[in-house]
Amino acid sequence: VDNTRIFSTGFSYGGMMSFAVGCELSDVFRAIAPMAGSLYSDFNCRGTGPAIAMWGAHGTSDTVVPPEDGRAARDKILQQNHCGTETVPVEPSPCVKYQGCDPGYDVTWCEWDGPHGIPNFGSAAIAEFFLQF
């Protein structure tokens, strides 16, 4: 196993697991791609571990895992990677990439107009994101 290419992705509960991996096992995993996930309310992610690259997506009309919970989990990874608040649009639309992150540890976030689900662009975008490593 190439230890520099270990990734985690998941949807809903799997997205929560990917966020947890990003917080607690960023020294093992290179990147995560949570979709419609968040962090458990009793999970103490401090956002202080080693940086981890992330591509994440969340539907704006998700009623199962509220978008604000996904944003809160994303913000822990932004903190962990020392990212700024400025973003630039990236493909696929409506994704944005945060600026000022630790070199090699980009954070891409895609809020799409949809419910609790996987966006139609999700699988291809995640594969492309992971292939850069």
Regions found by a protein language model. Name each.
Residues W55-A57, E68-R71, I77-F133:
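C-terminal catalytic histidine-bearing segment of alpha/beta-hydrolase fold enzymes
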Residues S8-G10, M35, A57:
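Short beta-strand immediately N-terminal to the catalytic nucleophile in serine-hydrolase-like folds
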Residues V1-Y13, C23-V28:
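Gly/Ser-rich "nucleophile elbow"/oxyanion-hole loop immediately N-terminal to the catalytic nucleophile
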Residues V1, E24-D27, R46-P50, Q99-Y105:
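Extracellular/periplasmic catalytic domains that process cell-envelope and extracellular macromolecules
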Residues V28-S38:
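A conserved short beta-strand
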Residues M17-V21:
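Hydrolases whose catalytic domains are alpha/beta-hydrolase-1, hotdog thioesterase
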